[in-house]
A protein has these predicted regions:
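Divalent metal-dependent hydrolysis catalytic cores, especially in the metallo-beta-lactamase
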Residues: 24-57, 78-86, 108-109, 115, ...
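Active-site environment of divalent metal-dependent phosphoester hydrolases
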Residues: 11-13, 52-55, 88-90, 117, ...
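Active-site gating/metal-coordination segments in enzymes
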Residues: 59-156
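Short, acidic/polar
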Residues: 27-37, 90-102, 184
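Catalytic pocket-lining loop regions of alpha/beta-barrel enzymes
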Residues: 105-109, 122-239
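Short, electropositive alpha-helical surface patch
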Residues: 58-79, 99-102, 106, 166-170, ...
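Mid-to-C-terminal alpha-helical segments outside catalytic/metal-binding sites
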Residues: 1-10, 15-44, 226-227, 231-239, ...
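Active-site neighborhood of phospho(di)ester-bond hydrolases with catalytic His/Asp-centered motifs
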Residues: 3-6, 46-48, 82-84, 111, ...
């Protein structure tokens, strides 16, 4: 089975490097990613652009929009990406640069970091971003749920706050990153109600295969997620993602295979990403 990783990172972020070294125990480089993807039959990754202007600075209010992938000098050939949006840096020049970037074949959407920046999804500060999404027919990805930084503010990342923007911008398809975890039942209602809302299941855990297995063996840890998946009862709305480098690729695939019904694997691991991110088609043909 071919797999698309619909959410990973490839940026020079201190916390990502520390996580790769100390928690997930992986090689956070193009070589390391290529080796993990090859072993797991991952044919394409969709990276989420993010940058910091100083060490351990994310969320960085000074990082220029569009935030890209700056881990290395070049982006791997099997990676497309969604440039990141800093709402504090959305002046005319930055919006023009963002729009110019959207015409590139490898740019397949945009990423808004709710919770990391203190604005709700429906705030007018993001209106120019939504207008560009409509103009270019691109999906918008939102960070939702727990933030990978103590400086984040959780109220802005709650999945219920996406309902208003999903209703207002029906012509845009949105992806709720992390399914709003731990508020996944609220996220499930937003997905169930809105035809233009999807979710990825990346970043639910951090660590090695042993760390993932420990949570899977727990009688309680995934109860909230299983409840939310059953409530939604529509696996055409969910995408696979790793949030690499937070976890190793193959162990996370194996974890998701335990949680997603076998009959939905083709959609979850591949087809739904092609549907939500149509610009990736030339990269997988």
């Amino acid at each position: 089975m071919k797999i698309i990783d619909a959410h990973l990172h490839f940026s020079n972020i201190t916390s990502f490097k520390d996580t790769a070294r100390d928690l997930s125990k992986l090689d956070y480089s193009s070589k390391g990613l290529w080796e993990e993807y090859r072993a797991a039959n991952v044919v394409l990754g969709i990276a989420m652009g993010v940058t910091e202007t100083r060490s351990d600075g994310f969320p960085d209010y000074d990082a220029a929009t569009p935030m890209g992938l700056d881990l290395e000098g070049e982006i791997p050939e099997n990676i497309c990406y969604c440039p990141g949006i800093n709402p504090y840096r959305l002046g005319p020049g930055e919006l023009a640069e963002l729009e110019e970037l959207l015409s590139k074949p490898e740019v397949v959407g945009m990423k808004i970091y709710l919770g990391y920046y203190p604005f709700y999804a429906y705030d007018d500060v993001y209106k120019p971003v939504y207008e560009l999404a409509i103009k270019y027919g691109l999906p918008v990805v939102f960070h939702t749920g727990d933030t990978y930084s103590e400086r984040g503010l959780l109220k802005y990342a709650h999945p219920l706050t996406l309902d208003e923007v999903a209703v207002k911008y029906r012509e845009i398809n949105f992806m709720m990153a992390h399914f709003g975890d731990p508020w996944v039942l609220d996220g499930a209602e937003v997905l169930y109600k809105n035809r233009n809302m999807y979710a990825d299941l990346c970043g639910l855990l951090v660590g090695t295969r042993a760390d993932l297995q420990k949570k899977l063996d727990s009688p309680y840890f995934f109860n909230h997620l299983k409840h939310a998946l059953a409530f939604t009862d529509d696996y055409s709305k969910f995408l696979f993602g790793t949030d690499w480098p937070l976890v190793q690729v193959q162990p996370y695939i194996d974890l998701m295979k335990e949680l997603i019904p076998a009959e939905a694997h083709e959609d979850f691991f591949f087809n739904n990403a092609v549907k939500l991110f149509p610009k990736i088609k030339p990269f997988i043909e």
